[in-house]
Amino acid sequence: MKRKSVDSKKVVAILLIVVFSLVAILKLTTVFVSIVNYKINNKKWNDGIGIIYDQHLDNIKDYRYGFGTIGENGCGAVAIYNIMCLENKKVALPKIIKSMDNGQMFFGLLGTKPTRILSYLKKHGFDAQLHEDKSKFEALSQDSKYCIYIYVGKSGGHYSLLVHNSDSETFRSINPRGITTMSDMMEENQNKFINLLITVK
């Protein structure tokens, strides 16, 4: 009995339809979730909240972000919010979360894409650059007003906002709060899988 030959063009067409359908579903889901999250977050927002030094505080941690919360995966959005506060460009956290909701990794359960952070900063008038070469981090950081140090390791990742103390080589760390240097940050995270730096002027 002769076997029917498989029409490779039909197979490719079906696969493309499936892929494009999945992409469309993911996009629609992201948009829907961001709208729902914004409505929930906006109801609880208090304009009196200033700089956020800890995303795990009771009045912050339960804000919705993707399918998770700010306390779990919102360090990127918090870094953006804090820069806007420091620059007196007060933007409500729910608005920033809504913008970041379109740049999530796996519906926000893995945080925010660095490129989304970068595009947000540039859109709001900052000279922001993303760097991968760790050997240049120290020099680049000294020429920047703010830095966002990004690391990813076995136990997860974090976006740490660093504010340059212009009279020294030290930085004020926000979320978590403290004083550090770029060399200390690199040494502390030397065994992480990913180390990136966003410089902001």
What are the roles of these predicted feature ranges?
Residues 2-105:
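Active-site-adjacent structural segments surrounding the nucleophilic cysteine of cysteine proteases
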